[in-house]
């Protein structure tokens, strides 16, 4: 069973995670209260251009935080990666799951969003009724904003950007 993508939707004012996978489904709420799909989409649009730093969840990056993230993720934080990340000290930073966690208030990695899925199906089913759903694949997550586009915190060389879903394999 290979998980390809993930989506979000609202059900009675609750945000529900839905990783897309065939043919099984699993239901589990991710967040409740006043968080809406419209709010998630607006949040993502507002964060376009935000620097990507692996492990960041929307906080202002400091040297202390960067050092902690490097200790926690030594495989990612090579000397080259750290040299790129240090440029973002003093700015709000995020990684892919942090973009969503920043909005929901639930700090999670992309796999945690997968684990809290409500339903799974193939990305082939993506359509315009799914605006605001989060697209998931192993190790990465983004938010579908319609017309074949998503917003994703893509990587340290890209930051948070609008991408064609078809260009995000």
Predicted features, each with a name:
Residues 120-129:
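Short, surface-exposed secondary-structure edge patches
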Residues 143-168:
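Catalytic Cys-His active-site segments of thiol-dependent hydrolases/isopeptidases
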Residues 22-97, 101-106, 138-139, 151-157:
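N-terminal capping segments
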Residues 131-133:
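Loop/turn positions that initiate beta-strands
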